Amino acid sequence: MNTKKYLFATLAFIIVGFVIAFVWHLVIFKSVYDSLKIYSIEPIIALGFISFILEGLAFVYIFQFFRRGRKPLQEGLIFGLVVYGVIMGGVGVLAEGAKHATTSLSTWLIVESAFYIITGAVLGIMVGLIYGKSPGK
């Protein structure tokens, strides 16, 4: 494992992912989420940040086993969409929607699914580009 790339990609994941989540949930779509009444009145920002630390450590670690080092952008995009968009999104959207009361389940499903897909694509591409092509590929 290339420790420098791992740490850099993880740090980038944490910072970029947290910024996307913060802006998405607490700025751009704040009124939508407020109207859904699915979140606590005061979000606990520290828990969100800790979540991104854990996600980043795992996402980047597992990415190293997935990548082939030939097409970093494409490999990162696919990995991000599958791991973040589908797997994490499945839990974050479907399971949360099933467990919590909301004023509009369809709005929740659309907005939160879009968040996971877009975030997964951005983070996957970014990590793929940080790792880049493998030598000789």
Give the residues covered by each predicted segment.
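Juxtamembrane/disordered regions of integral membrane proteins
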Residues: M1-K137
